[in-house]
């Protein structure tokens, strides 16, 4: 943390006494000239520069660059030290969520970071100053553990008349430390403009300096695929499979031992099919539906990954570390499991015998569940369909090349899906569907265009059948008093709901009548449906998504609010999600073949569940950030060829530094900086989430339609900069 010298304190006091009125640096010097200990102009200007560098003072702007107070420092309260995780914002101030108390969140100014970076585990303390809003100020005392070992950056060589100067520019804009590159770490003939991975060897917290060394050469900085790998590295994502793990996987094969017949049902005669995106290779799930006089019987067959991946094996250890497959733009996939398993042995490829775990559910003619069974089985998928194929068949645009039994099963599946959908809506499932896009790339991974995704009937059918299977498995395990990781989504807080209601009120969205303390998912769903025809419905859904927050895994049996379910888990994707694989192991250990496992093995897994859930939750956030960063990078790369083009859109967010406009053409948010908005000086009113002109009272609010010109691309922030027309 920065400790001000007496000279810096004097300068700060002079600026503060102006009570918000800008003061020129020269006036500060003049006011100090009569001091008996006048240090000289040079030292005063240097001290002012330090206060500006530390963001304790700021420039008011304009030609004169007059000084204003930006942040008031305070003494640290070192008698109580806490621990927490640091999250940095774009201006390199941040927040620490304490791990020691009730998860209180503290604000940390840039001058109090002490060299800590985004995601670091730190020891910190409160500052001796009043609470501001709902947060106390804090300062980092020391870094307990860096969030990552390697960081991605661009290696540059500057050659002047005297010597070569080596520089690294970090990809992450939140990496604020000034780097000194160890020349001995630089490989021979390493070219300028090369993407590399570096590590911090030493750091000076008082001056925000660090010594770094090159650890890995990724490739040409202008290569999009190299940049995607750098994004994964910066998010601590493993994008290569361990050679030892590959070797173990390659030794596995489909076995046909007689012992399987004792506990596996033979369902190879049933007309199972898979329906997935066109590019999918890891086919987790197959379905078969038959009609009976009293309703329907649904068979959801899920790849039996647990049969091949033993706990604590080399393959399992890596899968547990990865926690999930990653799907990046341009169909770039980083599988959780080696391809021998994910695309071959476990994938439910057509015309191949495969081991599965089946969730069999019988429904009445209204789509209400009557009975359920869970058991291991063997199936043969009769066909591999894409969503596009099935949707075209539904719309009578093409035929499916398959047997009549498959056609009958698909027809029954769609009828059942509609009934399940009606039951889900009745109990309060919230429809949060909104516009989504995909980036199309060429063979060199350069972006070509952005397409809007279509979520049609085939996608909805599979989603409904998977949701009911996931929920059924959660209920069966819960009713058998078996501990499991639930997928949970708590009720939104009263404060967040109140803020949402006030914001969407400006969009002519009807004011809901529900109680904010006891609101149900049914009431939220009804509120959405009431406004389906509102022109601002799309932004309403976006704001509601932000209000509801993110679902996560927990060993506590909490509700999944947006689905409207009291017990929910993930069972249907064990090839690509470690939680699902864990659920399968629980089924084997407790329900399918309990005699093949010891009580100690069951207890070990039970004790590990919370750690598994926490690890997956943490990694899921990194994966989401990775996917967002990759999307932003490729979108801005595509937009860089459209400088000067005019876009229409609506305001999707408002901040103290500007307006984010979601462009209709590509569904991407561009930034209109507050300093570039013409005709007035605009003030951010946080309570109302608007920008308001000081002279004209003109207001910009969320949902407003705008036109703006693309003026530049900020590749560091991966951001499109727009100018209002």
Curated annotation (Swiss-Prot):
Signal peptide: none
Domain of life: Bacteria
GO terms, biological process: mRNA catabolic process
RNB domain segment(s): 264-592
Gene Ontology molecular function: any one: RNA binding
Reactions the enzyme catalyzes: Exonucleolytic cleavage in the 3'- to 5'-direction to yield nucleoside 5'-phosphates
Main location as per UniProt: cytoplasm
S1 motif domain residues: 644-725
Transmembrane segment boundaries: none
Localization: Cytoplasm
EC number(s) recorded for this UniProt protein: 3.1.13.1
HAMAP family, A to Z: RNase_R (MF_01895)
Family: Belongs to the RNR ribonuclease family. RNase R subfamily.
Record protein name field: Ribonuclease R
Species, as recorded: Mycoplasma genitalium (strain ATCC 33530 / DSM 19775 / NCTC 10195 / G37)
Gene: rnr
């Amino acid at each position: 943390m920065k400790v001000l010298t007496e000279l810096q304190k004097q300068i700060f006091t002079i600026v503060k006494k102006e009570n918000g009125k800008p003061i020129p640096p020269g006036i500060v010097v003049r006011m100090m000239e009569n001091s008996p200990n006048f240090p000289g102009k040079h030292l005063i200007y240097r001290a002012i520069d330090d206060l500006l560098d530390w963001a304790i003072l700021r420039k008011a702007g304009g030609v004169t660059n007059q000084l204003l107070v930006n942040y008031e420092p305070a003494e640290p309260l070192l008698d109580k030290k806490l621990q927490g995780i640091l999250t940095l914002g774009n201006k390199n101030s941040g927040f620490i969520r304490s791990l020691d108390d009730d998860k209180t969140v503290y604000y940390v100014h840039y001058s109090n970071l002490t060299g800590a970076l985004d995601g670091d585990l730190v020891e910190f303390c409160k500052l001796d100053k009043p609470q501001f809003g709902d947060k106390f100020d804090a300062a980092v005392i020391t870094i307990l553990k860096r969030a990552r070992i390697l960081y991605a950056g661009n290696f540059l060589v500057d050659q002047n008349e005297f010597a070569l100067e080596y520089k690294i520019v970090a990809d992450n804009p939140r990496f604020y430390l000034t780097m000194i590159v160890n020349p001995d770490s630089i490989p021979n003939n390493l070219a300028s403009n090369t993407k590399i991975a570096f590590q911090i060897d030493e750091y000076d917290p008082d001056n925000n300096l660090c010594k770094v060394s090159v650890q890995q050469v990724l490739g040409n900085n202008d290569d999009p695929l190299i940049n995607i790998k750098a994004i994964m590295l910066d998010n601590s994502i493993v994008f290569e499979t361990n050679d030892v793990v590959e070797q173990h996987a390659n030794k596995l094969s489909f076995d046909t031992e007689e012992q399987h017949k004792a506990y596996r049902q033979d369902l190879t005669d049933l007309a199972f099919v898979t329906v997935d995106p066109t590019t999918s290779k890891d086919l987790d799930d197959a379905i078969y539906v038959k009609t009976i006089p009293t309703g329907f019987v649904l068979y959801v067959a899920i790849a039996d990954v647990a049969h091949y991946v033993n706990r604590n094996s080399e393959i399992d250890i890596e899968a547990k570390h990865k926690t999930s497959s990653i799907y990046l733009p341009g169909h770039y996939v980083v599988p959780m499991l080696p391809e021998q398993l994910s695309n071959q042995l476990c994938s439910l490829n057509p015309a191949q015998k495969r081991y599965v775990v089946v969730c069999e559910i019988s429904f009445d003619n209204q789509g209400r569940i009557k009975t359920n069974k869970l058991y291991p089985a063997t199936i043969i998928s009769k066909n591999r369909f894409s969503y596009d194929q099935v949707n075209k068949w539904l719309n009578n645009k093409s035929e499916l090349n398959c047997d009549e039994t498959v056609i009958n099963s698909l027809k029954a599946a769609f009828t059942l899906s509609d009934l399940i959908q009606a039951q889900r809506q009745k109990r309060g499932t919230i429809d949060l569907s909104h516009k989504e896009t995909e980036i199309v790339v060429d063979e060199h991974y350069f972006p070509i265009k952005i397409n809007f995704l279509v979520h049609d009937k085939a996608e909805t059918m599979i989603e409904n059948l998977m949701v009911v299977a996931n929920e059924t498995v959660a209920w069966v395990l819960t009713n058998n008093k078996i501990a499991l990781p639930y997928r949970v989504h708590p009720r939104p807080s009263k404060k967040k709901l109140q803020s949402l209601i006030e914001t969407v009120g400006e969009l002519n969205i009807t004011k809901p009548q529900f109680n904010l303390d006891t609101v149900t998912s049914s009431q939220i769903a009804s509120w959405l449906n009431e406004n389906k025809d509102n022109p601002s419905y799309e932004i309403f859904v976006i704001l509601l998504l932000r209000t509801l927050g993110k679902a996560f895994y927990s060993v506590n049996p909490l509700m999944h609010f947006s689905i409207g379910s009291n017990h929910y888990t993930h069972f249907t994707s064990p090839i690509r999600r470690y939680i699902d694989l864990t659920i399968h192991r629980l089924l084997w250990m407790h329900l399918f073949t309990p005699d093949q496992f010891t009580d100690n093995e069951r207890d070990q897994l039970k004790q590990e569940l919370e750690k598994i859930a926490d690890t997956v939750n943490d990694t899921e956030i990194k994966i989401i950030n990775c996917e967002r960063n990759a999307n932003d990078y490729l979108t801005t790369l595509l937009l860089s060829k459209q400088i000067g083009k005019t876009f229409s859109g609506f305001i999707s967010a408002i901040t103290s530094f500007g307006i984010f406009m979601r462009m209709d053409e590509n569904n991407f948010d561009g930034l209109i900086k507050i300093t570039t908005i013409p005709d007035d000086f605009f003030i951010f009113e946080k309570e109302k989430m608007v920008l308001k002109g000081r002279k004209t009272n003109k207001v910009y609010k969320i949902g407003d339609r705008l036109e703006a010109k693309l003026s530049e691309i900020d590749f560091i922030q991966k951001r499109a900069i727009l100018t209002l027309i």
